[in-house]
Amino acid sequence: VEEWIIRDEASILNQLGFKVSDFVEQRISDGTFKKNDLEFTKNSFVQKNIMTECENIYAKTYKDSIINLIEDKFSFEKKVYERSAQLYWFGGELINTVENIYEKWNLFLSCFKILKCEVSNSIALDQNNMRPRAALRWRLICLHNSNGFFGLPTNKEIEIYGISHAEFGKEGIVREFILIDEISIWKQLLL
């Protein structure tokens, strides 16, 4: 049995009134975060064998959607979300409507040149009286090469770890949860 235990530390920090980047800078200056921590972070992503009994059309659709969304940087030819979709974004943010969802993804991705996108785990479930749903664990290897959400470009190669959960309606995703380790991103940029 594999269990993913996670929490949105960026959301906790935001609720306490801290900026994530300031928190990481403080932890670097007090010696809590060290450069050798990065090697552990970068070696922690292991691709697992896909459990075929947990894979179905929704897992494949979601996996393809996320990869296309990230790699194609929003050539919106393929419809991924229903018009009234909701996105629960890392940091405790709730985004409503498909236009705002694409804008949020674009803002996040615009400061990176994506070098590699891979999914290590996918699982899906389709039960009576519930919306079909799927979950993914994924990683991006990218170059921080543009201004944006993560400040001025550092030209550092970083790894971004994420998990996603989606619920599907008749025309696409109706509700999605995205959790990204924002503290890890800032550590890689600032150390």
Where are these regions (language model features)?
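C-terminal and inter-domain tail/linker signature
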Residues: 1-191
